[in-house]
Amino acid sequence: MDDLQDMAPLQLGVSPAMEHAAAALCNLKIEMDRYARGFIGQPYLDDWMGTHGTCAYWGDELLRLAVPFLDWERGVGERFKALVDPRHVLGASIKGLPEHIPEKDVPERIARYAKTLGSSDHVLYFWYKPLGILTAHEGKHRVAFMRAHDQPAIAAWVCEASYPAAERITVIAPNDERDDWLAMLDERYVQVLRRPRVSLLLLQAYGVKVRRWRDLPDMPNEARVRQAMNERKLHRNPKTIAEADRTLDLEVVHQRAHEDAEPVIRTIHDLEHHRFEWRRYGAVLAGCLVIAMILSFVDYPLTRSAGMLLMGIATGLAWGLSLIRFVGRRRS
């Protein structure tokens, strides 16, 4: 094992506002873990996380729920050794809480967590450096333990992960309070803020601005964008952690709007949401045809003329459906 007692603690290098918001989220995670496995505590966690589980959730799951585009640029760097302040780590108390450790084992465990380092299979943290937050991939339980005993640092392997600059992100406030809050990256990619109040606290501390859709130039129709997001159920928990599974590309919306605006030719049978009522139409056509045939056998000029007229009407009705054309937008 490596001795790290002479190493300086990892410096987060973020603004005071971001550091405060990051620490607040980590504090919340500690409290949330205490609800895990509870009779109503676990269902409460499941509802808040938008999924279902049987224990405390991993730190990256919480961060991914609160922060949009979290892994958009996750170019993980080489791992390095560091002493990490547990107040800025999202851990998980999955198998127990700090007070479950026997009192006689506490000093030895504190010394081991604080001063020695094994392999990354034992303790590995991902550092979202621009946000000042670390998530525990391995070594999750020691976060709450070291915090409970007021310890300043955990010896850990750390991998630095990137995050888009604040200038590239815009939070979009809804005009209707019943609509979802959105986050947009590079004026092209959109995600739903499923926990908007928590997300706003973090993103505004990071430096992200809040705007409304109508104030953004060269954007597709907001209703069309929200419809596309609802069709893909982007307001629900995604099936994977891939950013593509929770992101709408506005270029796709632009392309679809262009295609929908193209003029197309339709017959009467192509009218959407309508079914041709053929019985009445067919009855009139058949009636004209039958009467015309009957009148054609009557040897009287006026009757023959009437029969020819009805025959013409029947023929026109028969051909009319195939000749009628409607020109309009592909979609209204």
Model-flagged regions — what are they?
Residues 250-271:
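Juxtamembrane amphipathic/hinge helix adjacent to a transmembrane helix
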Residues 273-332:
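Transmembrane alpha-helical hairpins and terminal membrane-anchor modules
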